[in-house]
Amino acid sequence: MSRFADWRVSAVPELRAILLAEKAEVPARTMRIADMSTNPDKQAVRAEALAKAAYERSLATTLGVGEMYWVSADMVGLALDAAGDVPGFNPATDLPASHGFMVLEQPLPALRTWVFDTDYQKRDVELEVDVIAWSTVGTGIRIESFCRNGRVPNAIDNGSFFEPVWYHTGVVDGLYEFDDEAAVELTVQLMSFLAAAALLMASPGVADRTTLAPKTKAARKDAKRGRSGNVTVISLHAPKHVPTGDADESGRVYTHRWMVRGHWRNQPHGPNRSQRSVRWIPSYIKGPAGKPLRETERVWAWRR
């Protein structure tokens, strides 16, 4: 299988196939790293490596039957912005599927993480995030992020296409509070983006969802194995325009239109409106029709 794939919607099944193939190689690669370790307790290192390899195989099995998503660049930007104040996150109820492979058209800002260098020693690096994958195994969930390996300086040349960036392993049916002071910052950043993306995907007034069935070799292989080769494409609705007069009540004259930023809201629903669900109130353009739109420069950054 080629370890070089185009970065486009139709290539998503191939990208997933590449990741699954690389996960299948984890046992041998993990053992090589264990053998090169300078840790004096070689037996413990090898036992840990074997356990990791077995877990990776179970993740690959579930990921292979999961849903595939392509998130457009504008939707990535909105989700990253919305992640800054997204409320708590329950993977069991908020994620669109139990297992998923999400490819981002535009990468997320770099996370401070580490890789093994050419001497098989850990080295701190900053890696962008191109892919997020999640797998539910029993009562637990594994959320992983990956960078295209071509962006990793001085990494081990193992022929892999993807480089792991960061991951989280925890309970699938539980509320994750992002404002918890004990939470790991990298985990908060990764999961808050995924939470925002998942909640926005479920908001029909915000996101457009279309289904593409790529006619590619990888998609045909998925079909032969009984897997769905369809890719859900998530893109952003154009913001609505809320017209106003040319002046406000005080007599101030408007010379431009402007963007009003979206925000999260707990909306009541259900019997006697006793239940609450998190909804994104989308951004909209306000001001007199026909006036120029005042553009503001935005810098996408991780939640702090």
Task: Describe each model-derived feature in a short phrase.
Residues T210-R304:
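Arg/Lys-rich, low-complexity, intrinsically disordered basic segments
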Residues M1-P239:
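Intrinsically disordered, low-complexity regulatory segments
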